Amino acid sequence: MLTMSTLRKSDTEFHHGDLQVALVTAGLRHVEKHGLNSLGLRQLALVTGVSPTAVYRHFADLEHLKTSVAKASREVLGKMMLESLNKVSKSKTSKGAIDRFLAIGGAYIDFGIKKSNLYEIAFICFDSPELEPTSPSSWDLLMNSLNELNELGCLSDKNLKTAPTIAWSMVHGFAGLAAQGATGNSGETLASKKVVLQSVLKCLEIKDTL
């Protein structure tokens, strides 16, 4: 965890990996509070209490930093989805599987609503070969849920093929609108969120087999 004592450390007091983690954590917090456009390498050096040279040892340029902060943002998303999933019954029934599917979809939308600045950066750069896969992975959570629905007979083999793209697109699109404040007040957004999630079920013909 990044603490005030960590922020006061000199360059030499950081282990190589520790400084990189501290920089990404500081960048993540900065973006969440102030937005993507204010993120900068020199500003990050000031916040973490190290020299600009130390920052450049880890991030060659601003785009490199943004890529790492984007990955960290996606991990926040994955954790939100996993936390929501863990609050739902683990019953191996069709209703349980549908509830879990709705839980991760709802958490994805909540990420856009509650952490709009992180949503903005999360998917702007995610194809760098230097990055390890995110953990937990929001994509893996989606695929696991869809496969479970298919195994329980709630989702047909035919629809399973297109389900990932359709489900992701619908939820991601609404989350993006919510992140921009384009879905009305909190009550209107919540109502629309429920409609979108039910629309995903209908579009994919996901049914409770009882």
Per-region residue spans from a language model:
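An amphipathic alpha-helix signature
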Residues: I98, L102, G106, W139, ...
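Helix-turn-helix
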Residues: A22, A26, H30-H64, S68
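Alpha-helical DNA-contacting segments of helix-turn-helix folds
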Residues: V31, K66-S73, M80, A122, ...
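N-terminal intrinsically disordered/low-complexity leader segments
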Residues: M1-D18, V88, D208-L210
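Generic hydrophobic, amphipathic alpha-helix propensity
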Residues: L19-L28, L44, V69-S73, L77, ...
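Short secondary-structure transition hinges
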Residues: D110-N144, T183-S186, L190
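Hydrophobic alpha-helical connector segments
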Residues: L82-K115, A167
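Hydrophobic/aromatic-rich alpha-helical bundle segments in the mid-to-C-terminal region
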Residues: L131-E132, P136, L149-S199, D208-L210
